[in-house]
């Protein structure tokens, strides 16, 4: 109906470049970096805000650029079903070439023994934290036998001395390496990897 196809690149809206629209409005979005601001901006369809029923867009398709008028819709009129066939219930699995994969959102601390037993002889393990993971990075590090290392530094208040603060090292791992995992550790992150995801990434890097 609107002559839009998967793979089309929308470069302008009402003759204004996408980058310019974002730069003008990003100051109104609360986020730590531009990547997250762009995600929020896109998710809420700010690029297509208008008081009219239609907008003009510039499309790049197959190395050609052309203008198109598209209709605007209410959200309730749109089919926003995600048709991807990704099994979001996967906790862990073995990939080709003897590589392990762990989804940190679908797995939890009760799965650590099972994960280690099945993936301990793999060449590498991919920990996917492009999500909001469950809190068991500590148990993963300990189970994989890594010796204790500093993962983060925290500033804490000295309650016996008002106004005084001190540094505290946050360490994860075992007192000594016990049959440590010998393969490579790969951590998958993206703009969704925030808060607990960031903390989990620091834990796994120890």
Pin down the residues of each PLM region.
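Short, structured coil/loop segments at alpha-helix boundaries
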Residues: 1-3, 32-34, 99
């Amino acid at each position: 109906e609107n002559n839009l196809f998967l793979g089309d690149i929308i470069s302008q809206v009402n003759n204004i470049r996408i980058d310019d629209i974002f730069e003008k409005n990003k100051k109104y979005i609360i986020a730590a970096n531009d990547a997250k601001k762009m995600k929020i901006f896109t998710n809420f369809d700010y690029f297509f805000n208008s008081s009219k029923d239609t907008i003009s867009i510039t499309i790049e398709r197959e190395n050609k650029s052309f203008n198109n008028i598209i209709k605007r819709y209410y959200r309730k009129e749109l089919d926003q079903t995600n048709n991807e066939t990704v099994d979001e219930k996967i906790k862990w699995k073995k990939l080709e070439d003897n590589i392990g994969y762990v989804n940190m959102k679908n797995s939890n601390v009760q799965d650590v023994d099972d994960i280690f037993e099945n993936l301990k002889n793999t060449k590498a393990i991919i920990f996917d934290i492009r999500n909001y993971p469950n809190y068991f990075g500590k148990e993963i590090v300990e189970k994989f036998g890594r010796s204790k290392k500093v993962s983060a530094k925290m500033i804490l208040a000295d309650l016996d001395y008002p106004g005084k603060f001190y540094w505290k090292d946050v360490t994860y791992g075992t007192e000594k390496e016990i049959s440590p995992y010998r393969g490579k550790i790969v951590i998958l992150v993206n703009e969704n990897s925030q808060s607990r995801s960031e903390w989990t990434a620091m834990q796994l890097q120890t």
